[in-house]
């Protein structure tokens, strides 16, 4: 019994062999677990390292691409050439004309010979040949109707009556709706009354001649007669001051100014005492009227003018009329 107790005490105090074997197995388990954990750690670290390396490789590749792009940009920038002025003469020929220029291109011909293209451009100015196409005498039209005959009251829209509208945008020269209507009526009336062809026909027919001048009395009614004089125009011709504008001067008309060679007309007798008549050369002196051959002597005419005074009627030998009698 004593031996068992001692063994138990020794086992308790120092442990038994089984106990010594059991911790060894635990240590082995711990070492195995530690080995496994180390393997896991090594795997995780290896995975992390691989991820880091991949990231680094991606960053390096992106940096390399950026570097390549920058190098390409720099290379492309180096390839840029700045050319100032014309580097080569142009093959095209431009023909221009002097005078007012016109930007219209009339003809462009391309000549393809041997692969060379020479463009020939011809610029012809027709502005000098063409006159103005604006007729100042024509009346403007609105919807196919003369503007002076348009009734403003029949228009659907009257924008000049809108609030805030500027009337000068629709009527020029200070006109408004009412004054323009009056102006159009007056213009239509004047155009209807003034007909150049009708006026010319009246002048040629003698209807617009001067009023007759009383030159004498004939008959018992003492009506004045209009006798043609040397200075009056013939029938059917307008008087001197009433010639229409633009009518050419007709030759052979008596009393018309501006007739050339009036003094050199043949078979014109030398009329004495005519003012502004040039002296006719190689004309003999006219003898006295009383001593002209083959002419009877003219009787002495009474001197009526010697007894007259300024402002007094000459005495022709006719007794004066009797004084009026006072009638009571």
From Swiss-Prot:
InterPro entries, per the entry: Fip1_dom, Pre-mRNA_3'-end_processing_reg
Q: Where is the composition biased (Pro residues)?
A: 317-328
**Bias category Low complexity: which stretches?**
292-307
Compositional bias segments (type: Polar residues): 90-104
Q: Which GO terms describe its cellular component?
A: mRNA cleavage and polyadenylation specificity factor complex
Q: Where is the composition biased (Basic and acidic residues)?
A: 29-58
Kindly give the Pfam families that the UniProt entry links to this protein: Fip1
- Region (Disordered) residue spans: 1-105, 204-237, 292-328
Location in the cell reads: Nucleus
UniProt keywords (A-Z) are:
mRNA processing, Nucleus
User: Where along the chain is composition biased (Acidic residues)?
Assistant: 8-21, 62-81
The main location is nucleus
Query: Which GO BP terms sit in this record?
Result: mRNA processing
Q: To which protein family does this belong? A: Belongs to the FIP1 family.
Functional note: Pre-mRNA polyadenylation factor that directly interacts with poly(A) polymerase.
Return the PANTHER family for the record. Answer: FIP1-LIKE 1 PROTEIN, PRE-MRNA 3'-END-PROCESSING FACTOR FIP1
* Protein known as: Pre-mRNA polyadenylation factor FIP1
Please give the organism: Debaryomyces hansenii (strain ATCC 36239 / CBS 767 / BCRC 21394 / JCM 1990 / NBRC 0083 / IGC 2968) (Yeast)
């Amino acid at each position: 019994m004593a031996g068992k107790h001692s063994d138990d005490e020794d086992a308790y105090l120092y442990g038994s062999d089984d106990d010594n074997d059991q911790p060894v197995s635990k240590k082995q388990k711990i070492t195995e677990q530690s080995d496994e954990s180390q393997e896991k750690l090594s795997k995780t670290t290896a995975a992390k390292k691989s991820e880091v390396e991949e990231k680094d490789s991606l960053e390096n590749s992106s940096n390399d691409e950026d570097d390549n792009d920058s190098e390409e940009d720099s290379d492309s920038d180096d390839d840029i050439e700045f050319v100032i002025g014309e580097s080569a003469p142009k093959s095209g020929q431009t023909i221009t004309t002097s005078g007012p220029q016109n930007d219209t291109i009339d003809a462009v011909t391309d000549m393809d010979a041997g692969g060379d293209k020479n463009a020939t451009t011809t610029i012809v100015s027709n502005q000098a040949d063409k006159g103005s196409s604006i007729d100042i005498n024509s009346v403007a039209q609105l919807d196919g109707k003369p503007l002076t005959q348009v009734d403003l009251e029949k228009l659907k829209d009257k924008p000049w009556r809108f609030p805030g509208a500027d009337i000068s945008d629709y009527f020029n020269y200070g006109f408004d709706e009412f004054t323009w209507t009056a102006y159009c009526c007056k213009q239509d009336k004047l155009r209807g009354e003034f007909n150049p062809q009708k006026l010319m026909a009246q002048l040629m027919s003698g209807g617009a001649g001067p009023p007759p001048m009383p030159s004498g009395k004939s008959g018992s009614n003492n009506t004045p007669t209009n006798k043609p004089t040397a200075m009056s125009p013939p029938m059917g011709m307008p008087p001197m001051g009433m010639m229409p504008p633009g009518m050419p001067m007709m030759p052979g008309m008596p009393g018309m100014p501006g007739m050339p060679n009036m003094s050199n007309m043949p078979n014109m007798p030398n009329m004495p005492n005519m003012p502004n008549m040039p002296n006719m050369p190689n004309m003999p002196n006219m003898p006295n009227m009383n001593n002209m051959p083959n002419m009877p002597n003219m009787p002495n005419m009474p001197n009526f003018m010697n007894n007259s005074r300024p402002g007094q009627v000459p005495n022709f030998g006719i007794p004066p009329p009797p004084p009026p009698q006072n009638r009571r």
